[in-house]
């Protein structure tokens, strides 16, 4: 079983610390092969180390998705759990990222955190980018930066979900966004890495998704994957498939 666990809700509907999932609830989770800890921003939780420590009793692999802003907290956690995965959400090059994220120095904080983790010898680290009209032209340039740093580069497309408390996440210029995904696919296929070839297939599938066509990779939510919200409720889906 794989799981995605949101331990801090979105900025539009922030969860209250006293209402969020507790360590006692986490202890009741089943065995899992993979766990993604996300948010909001997970590193706002001051007990994140305790959460990770408990999850490693149940999960073979853990990845935390973060904006990379809390560098000291991230580094401190990674010193105790060097096997953990860290994916820092960077939404484009510096100006684009900071406009989308609303953080004046967000890009430099995220990029600086990635560099620091790499200097520490962390292996499972990389970028995560949600592609939309505003940042699609930065898709290949950001991939090249991650490639030069020897890091993973994960992508998804802008979408809606009741969980986001948002229904206006729409890609308007679909041909332009699709073209930039196509450029990324071509870059990935030039690699000698079979893993990047599979990434190319996934990103090719995102072009289908943008145009409202059937996904190439089916959604496995509720079959071997589940989602836990900040309040400990188990959800079988978070977005359209």
Question: What does each model-identified segment do?
Answer:
Residues 1-9, 234-241:
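Residue-level detector of conserved catalytic or cofactor/ligand-binding positions
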């Amino acid at each position: 079983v794989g799981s995605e666990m949101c331990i801090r809700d979105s900025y539009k509907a922030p969860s209250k610390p006293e209402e969020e999932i507790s360590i006692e609830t986490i202890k009741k989770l089943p065995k899992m092969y993979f766990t993604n800890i996300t948010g909001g921003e997970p590193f706002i939780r001051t007990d994140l180390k305790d959460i990770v420590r408990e999850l490693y009793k149940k999960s073979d692999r853990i990845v935390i998705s973060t904006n990379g802003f809390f560098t000291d907290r991230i580094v401190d956690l990674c010193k105790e759990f060097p096997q953990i995965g860290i994916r820092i959400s960077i939404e484009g090059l510096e100006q684009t990222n900071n406009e989308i994220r609303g953080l004046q120095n967000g890009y430099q904080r995220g990029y600086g955190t990635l560099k620091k983790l790499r200097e520490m010898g962390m292996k499972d680290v990389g970028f995560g980018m949600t592609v939309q009209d505003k940042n699609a032209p930065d898709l290949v340039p950001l991939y090249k930066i991650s490639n030069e740093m020897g890091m993973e580069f994960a992508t998804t497309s802008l979408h809606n979900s009741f969980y986001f408390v948002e229904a206006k996440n729409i890609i308007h210029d679909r041909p332009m966004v699709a073209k930039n995904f196509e450029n990324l696919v071509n870059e990935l296929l030039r690699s000698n890495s079979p893993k990047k070839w599979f990434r190319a297939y996934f990103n090719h599938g995102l072009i289908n998704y943008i145009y409202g066509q059937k996904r190439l990779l089916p959604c496995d939510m509720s079959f071997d994957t589940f989602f836990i919200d900040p309040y400990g409720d188990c959800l079988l889906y978070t977005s359209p498939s």
